[in-house]
A protein has these predicted regions:
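Short, charged, surface-exposed secondary-structure boundary motifs
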Residues: 62-63, 86-90
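His/Asp/Glu-enriched short active-site or ligand-binding loop at hydrolase and phosphoryl-transfer sites
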Residues: 75-86
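Short acidic/histidine-rich active-site segments
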Residues: 105-120
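Extended substrate/RNA-proximal surfaces in nucleic-acid metabolism proteins
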Residues: 1-77
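Conserved short secondary-structure transition element at the edge of the structured enzyme core
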Residues: 77, 96-108
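Active-site metal-binding loops of divalent metal-dependent hydrolases
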Residues: 56-58, 82, 112-113
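Short, hinge-like loop/turn segments at secondary-structure boundaries
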Residues: 13-14, 69-72, 94-98, 124-128
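Mid-to-C-terminal alpha-helical segments outside catalytic/metal-binding sites
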Residues: 122-140
Length: 140
């Protein structure tokens, strides 16, 4: 959610996701939210889209209070599967497990942008039995 997003949003130059075509995958900086973060999400909703926040577990500035506020606004959460495998460090893994345990995730995906990156992550990581169970029950 940056100035380029705002420009594209105003021009209706958006790439929606989902079977109904009204999901909008969004992300922010890992360290700071945009100044008008909640207002932007509300504008997205008013335009008929459902905001989907990519990898909420990776945002260092967020805590449970932030996650609960976002969920109360109707924002869906997409877990980065490699976060659950510990690829982004212990703090991200801890947040990922907490969000999973609270049933806050709606979708799963990866943040891999090419096949080489995917292969590296897959070769390095394994999930525990408990993590696999959590994924299986993810919004059945």
């Amino acid at each position: 959610l940056d100035s380029l997003f705002s420009e594209r949003f105003e021009q209706n130059d958006l790439l929606a996701i989902g079977t109904s075509g009204n999901g909008l995958l969004v992300e922010t900086s890992y360290y700071n939210p945009p100044m008008d973060f909640y207002d932007i999400l509300e504008k997205i909703r008013k335009k008929g889209f459902h905001p989907v926040l990519a990898h909420p577990e990776r945002y260092r500035y967020m805590d449970m209070k932030d996650y609960q506020k976002l969920k109360s606004m109707g924002v869906k959460f997409q877990m980065n599967l490699f976060s659950l495998a510990g690829s982004y460090g212990e703090e991200t893994l801890r947040k990922c497990c907490m969000l999973l345990a609270e049933g806050m995730y709606d979708l799963g995906g990866t943040d891999t942008h090419n096949l080489a990156m995917f292969r590296r992550f897959v070769a390095e990581k394994k999930l525990s039995k408990e993590e696999c169970k959590g994924l299986i029950t993810l919004k059945k």
